[in-house]
């Protein structure tokens, strides 16, 4: 070690000497403090190791296995959605809705009919976000089993077309991680939600990181909007990231049986 390095080490020791002296003095007066600090240090180290081990396990095992499972579930959901798109238009309620003159009112009637058709875990539509290369089938419900199939519609929020805030939750890791790049959305990006009765086009307003307990983000506002939520940051559930988008237009409204 060179002379300058020895001098630097000596200066460092001198700088920390008062701190070390105060620590030693505190330990002498409070014998239990040293043990407490050691326990706290060990606990922090263990916590860090557990977090790193969980991330490693996710990358090495859960990601590929759950992605395979997610792919199978998406394939099943695609078939289920195709069946729904074929059967829903032929229902008696849709035939009656076809006679409604007002386009806006017709969308509302169709949406109300649809909401009574679906059940938890069932495929209900498709979410398409070109800017992050997302095209995924969404399901009804945000329980664990539903989210393993794809993004899930918050059942306490209305369907697109019923007015207010429509919200979906999705994974950012595992099970194909459909919302992995939610943080890359920018104001102006387009989101399409394709339902069996109409297609709803939204434009992103922005994103925000919130606490998991912040349910205010899915509350009703004065206009029709879409909210997408996911855990944040990656490999952690300590926070949530939410993307907000305002409804721009409604198209491809179901005309009736066969239309």
Kindly give the residue locations of the regions a language model identified.
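N-terminal intrinsically disordered, acidic low-complexity segments at the extreme N-terminus
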Residues: 2-21
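Solvent-exposed, non-transmembrane regions of membrane-associated and secreted proteins
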Residues: 15, 22-26, 32-259
């Amino acid at each position: 070690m060179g002379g300058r390095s020895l001098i630097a080490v000596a200066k460092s020791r001198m700088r920390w000497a008062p701190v070390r002296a105060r620590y030693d003095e505190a330990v002498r007066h409070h014998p239990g403090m040293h043990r407490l600090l050691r326990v706290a240090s060990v606990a922090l180290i263990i916590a860090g190791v557990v977090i790193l081990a969980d991330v490693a396990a996710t990358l090495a095992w859960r990601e590929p296995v759950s992605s395979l499972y997610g792919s199978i579930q998406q394939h099943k959901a695609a078939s289920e959605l195709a069946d729904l798109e074929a059967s829903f238009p032929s229902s008696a309620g849709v035939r009656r809705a076809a006679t409604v003159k007002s386009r806006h009112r017709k969308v509302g009637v169709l949406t109300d009919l649809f909401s009574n058709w679906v059940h938890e875990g069932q495929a209900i539509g498709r979410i398409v976000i070109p800017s992050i290369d997302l095209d995924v089938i969404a399901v009804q419900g945000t329980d664990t089993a539903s989210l393993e199939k794809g993004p899930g519609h918050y059942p306490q929020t209305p369907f697109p077309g019923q007015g207010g805030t429509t919200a979906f939750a999705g994974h950012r890791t595992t099970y194909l991680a459909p919302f992995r790049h939610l943080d890359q959305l920018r104001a102006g990006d387009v989101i399409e939600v394709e339902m069996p009765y109409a297609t709803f086009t939204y434009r992103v307003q922005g994103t925000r990181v919130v606490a998991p307990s912040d349910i205010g983000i899915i509350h009703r506002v004065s206009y029709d909007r879409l909210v997408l939520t996911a855990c944040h940051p990656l490999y952690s559930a300590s926070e949530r990231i939410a993307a907000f988008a305002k409804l721009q237009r409604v198209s491809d409204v179901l005309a009736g049986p066969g239309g």
